[in-house]
């Protein structure tokens, strides 16, 4: 059973917490994790890319020269794809890149990501992760106290406005809540900073 240290907001260690092995102690399935990350990134795409076909480019309605007798190749429009400033043949058009994974796959990917973080020792549990006021300087001090360098993901059980706003302008720091956690955010962070209550919530859902 994995065990992690528990800290308070001053960075002082207050104890230890045993993590549920069914959630934080499985053998990570990296194939499923890859599928989940690929799915997340695909679903983030706007899909608004667009090019003009020969029918949509302005001009080119008249045949540039007669069909025969000039010695040049026959042409029907100066907006054909082979012309400079012509339309694009088979170019991208607006589309949705969204697709879904099965519940079983998404669940296994989440457990694999959490277990990988636990195995790497990158989970930092905070007892009472909250801010008394909106103060970026104080939140930076908190991160320094727990030695959270690099990219950090801060997870709370519910939206805590003071935490969200205090961390908003800190480069590399993202905030989220336990119910909207996703595999990409977990793996993209160097440190997984989570409220003790949020850990319990995750274990309740996934155990």
Q: Model-flagged regions — what are they?
A:
Residues 54-90:
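Glycine/serine-rich anion-binding loops at beta->alpha junctions
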Residues 31-68:
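A short, flexible low-complexity segment enriched in Lys/Arg and Gly/Pro that occurs
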Residues 1-46, 91-207:
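Extended polybasic, low-complexity segments that bind anionic RNA or targeting/receptor surfaces
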